[in-house]
Amino acid sequence: MLADLGEDARPLAGGHSLIPMMKLRLATPSHLVDLAGVPELKGIRQDGGDIVIGATTTQHELIGSALLADELPILRETSLLIADPQVRYLGTLGGNVANGDPGNDMPAVMMCLGATYQVAGKAGERRIAAREFYQGAYFTALEPGEIVTAIRIKAPPAGHGWAYEKLKRKVGDYATAAAAVMLTMDSGKVATCSIGLTNVSETPLWAEEAEKILVGSALDGATVRKAVAAAEAITSPAADSRGPVHYRTKMAGVMLTRALARAKERAR
């Protein structure tokens, strides 16, 4: 139906990304296609070594999932920092990742986790890596008529450390800056590390160079500072009511420092 209606149609799930954009006239679709009645788009399941989450699964359902609590606790931690309970009851994971809003929390987490988005359209199905999905503010790799149907994440190893640290002005606000970290430790040193940054560029950021600096280290102060500098170097935040460019850049570094410390504490 979306493909038949063309570029003037938009899918509607929870509506917490699309409806505010429509109110601001940033989106002016002629048709809304409600996805609420498609049960195949909802649910959380294990598929071999992957966790698969349907696109219309709400943040409230992510918080309540025993599977995610065991396998991907960073998703629960992040969901609890999104907006407020009213929004979390309706807002969906698919809407959060597919909208392309640089202020949304889940895209950077998905980059951190190396997630893949399952996408469907009139031409069939395909998969797109989260790290290749975001092309600019509100611009993604989705073609007209395509929707994200599920998010696929490889289950991290037991004993991994994780954290999502978010600075915001008030409850329900977008991040001034935020950082997602997942790592594993071996004999007191970082064996693997992945980092995503939220709302400090036109897209979520994957801090690959910072990761490389940290692998093999004991997360000593000098190495962490070097990695933080590498992460700050890829940011390009807008100066807005959340603060000037320099402040938001430095807050990204502060959030990353905190996330690394917390992830290290949690790693076993």
Task: Enumerate the language-model features and the residues they cover.
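C-terminal structural segment of proteins
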Residues: 1-268
